[in-house]
């Protein structure tokens, strides 16, 4: 009897090669998420912190916080989480122990809510044009103004608007438009009644047929004598263009000079006894070298406003003008010299070559019939090739018609972003002693926390 051996062959003893598993791929690196800008409550808390820091830097008391209408203080922790903290109720008691309503506390809470409302208006304008609002504080400082200036420039670029400047530089145009948008924000939220961030006023000029100064008094016609070096370019131009008003004389040092006699100059009534180019301490600082040209410039803006707004009742009696330039826009300290923007009439010599019969637009005819224009400049401008002046100065320069365009563009931006009509409320100009020409500025010390100087 034969025995059969059964041999079990395992699968591992097969002659076939065992397939090797492919190597595992290295783990993919996670893409870094772009740092998102804070939004919502986080953005408002960040702006409130910056505003508080700006107040502290200026030496003003108080702080800005974000608070809900349920009296909850909004804050953000280190991890970026929003925290709502119930406000502590404080009661002010008199000697008898009965609680008294704190008027100051109510006003402060109301101002907090208005500040939040103003911040919402501002973010609507800035976010519509992707403007970085990291420096926005709603205070009249350079950071806040720069935000609104960028919004104006973005609106002009995106709308493909072509703005023609007449005696105006673009920097001043954006500066004034930014001030107007800030003014809309403050007025819409009723944040600071009585404050005028625009720096512009409405002036009842009364210059329909005669010139009036900022005092509201008639300006006095005064002869002006200007002496120039006989070899200078201005002297040669005066001899060539106005030979009847110029002559060569010897001055008190025995040198030959060109004397220009101007009989059409007008000055403030407070400067009648002052020599040419000087102002008294009671003066408003207004002076025109050419009175008839100044009247023509006033007639031009009156006709221009009437053509733009036929139903405007005060188009021929009032005009919008910037009262402050870049030197004193966000400062209450007086300047050495003039305190208000210098008003100068500029003539449009090229307008005389245009045929009026071919023009039907009343806005254009306003300039063709009155080829002169009011230009608002720095309070104390320093001209090229002139000697250094001690006054603070800037390159502020905008014409009356471009100021109208500036307000129109600011209104368009507000309407397209906020969705409602802007609060156009400018104070009417009235003469005050703070507008007087300052001949002397008293020295002022700087802030120092040390007990002794040295």
Swiss-Prot record:
Instruction: Give positions of region: C-terminal arm, DBP binding.
Output: 440-454
Q: Where does the protein principally reside?
A: host cell
Chain residue ranges for the region called Flexible loop = 226-260
Keyword set, alphabetical order: DNA replication, DNA-binding, Early protein, Host nucleus, Host-virus interaction, Metal-binding, Phosphoprotein, Viral DNA replication, Zinc
Report the subcellular localization. Answer: Host nucleus
Q: Does the keyword NAD apply?
A: no
GO terms of molecular function: DNA binding; zinc ion binding
Q: Where is this region: Disordered?
A: 1-41
Q: Name one Pfam family in it.
A: Viral_DNA_Zn_bi
Q: What is the annotated role of this protein in its UniProt record?
A: Plays a role in the elongation phase of viral strand displacement replication by unwinding the template in an ATP-independent fashion, employing its capacity to form multimers. Also enhances the rate of initiation. Released from template upon second strand synthesis. Assembles in complex with viral pTP, viral pol, host NFIA and host POU2F1/OCT1 on viral origin of replication. Covers the whole ssDNA genome during synthesis. The complementary strand synthesis induces its relese from DNA template. May inhibit cellular transcription mediated by the interaction between host SRCAP and CBP.
Q: Which family is this sequence assigned to?
A: Belongs to the adenoviridae E2A DNA-binding protein family.
Under the heading HAMAP family, the entry gives: ADV_DNB2
Name of this protein? DNA-binding protein
Q: Which organism is it from?
A: Canine adenovirus serotype 1 (strain CLL) (CAdV-1)
Q: What is the lineage of its organism?
A: Viruses, Varidnaviria, Bamfordvirae, Preplasmiviricota, Tectiliviricetes
């Amino acid at each position: 009897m034969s025995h059969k051996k059964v041999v079990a062959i395992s699968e591992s003893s097969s002659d076939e090669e065992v397939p090797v598993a492919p190597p595992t791929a290295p783990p993919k690196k996670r893409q870094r998420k772009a740092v998102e800008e804070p939004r919502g409550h986080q953005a408002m808390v960040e702006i409130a912190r910056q505003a508080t820091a700006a107040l502290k830097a200026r030496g003003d008391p108080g702080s800005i916080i974000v608070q809900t209408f349920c009296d909850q203080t909004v804050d953000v922790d280190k991890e970026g989480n929003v925290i709502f903290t119930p406000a502590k109720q404080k009661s002010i008691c008199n000697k008898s122990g009965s609680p008294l309503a704190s008027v100051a506390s109510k006003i402060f809470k109301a101002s907090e809510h208005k500040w939040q409302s103003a911040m919402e208006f501002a973010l609507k304008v800035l976010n519509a044009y992707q403007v970085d609002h990291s420096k926005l504080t709603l205070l009249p400082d350079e950071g806040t103004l720069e935000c609104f200036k960028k919004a104006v420039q973005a609106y002009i670029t995106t709308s493909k608007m072509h703005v023609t400047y007449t005696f105006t530089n673009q920097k001043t145009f954006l500066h004034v438009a930014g001030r107007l948008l800030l003014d809309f924000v403050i007025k819409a939220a009723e944040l600071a009644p009585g404050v005028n961030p625009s720096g512009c006023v409405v002036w009842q000029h009364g210059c329909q047929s005669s010139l009036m100064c900022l005092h509201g008094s008639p300006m006095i016609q005064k002869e002006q004598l200007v002496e120039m070096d006989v070899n200078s370019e201005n002297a040669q131009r005066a001899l060539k263009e106005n030979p009847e008003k110029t002559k060569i004389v010897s001055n008190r040092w025995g040198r030959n000079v060109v004397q220009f006699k101007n009989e059409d100059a007008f000055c403030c009534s407070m400067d009648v006894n002052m020599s040419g180019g000087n102002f008294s301490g009671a003066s408003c600082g207004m002076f025109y070298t050419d009175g008839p040209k100044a009247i023509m410039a006033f007639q031009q803006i009156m006709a221009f406003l009437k053509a733009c707004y036929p139903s405007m009742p005060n188009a021929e009696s009032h005009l919008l003008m910037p009262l402050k330039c870049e030197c004193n826009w966000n400062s209450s300290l007086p300047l050495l010299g003039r305190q208000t923007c210098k008003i100068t009439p500029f003539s449009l010599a090229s307008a005389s070559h245009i045929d009026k019969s071919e023009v039907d637009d009343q806005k254009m005819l306003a300039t063709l019939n009155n080829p002169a224009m009011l230009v608002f400049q720095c309070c104390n401008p320093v001209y090229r090739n002139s000697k250094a002046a001690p006054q603070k100065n800037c390159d502020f320069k905008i014409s009356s018609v471009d100021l109208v365009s500036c307000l129109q563009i600011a209104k368009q931006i507000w309407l397209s972003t906020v969705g409602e009509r802007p609060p156009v409320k400018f104070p009417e100009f009235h003469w005050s002693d703070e507008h007087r020409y300052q001949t002397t500025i008293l020295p002022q010390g700087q802030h120092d926390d040390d007990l002794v100087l040295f």
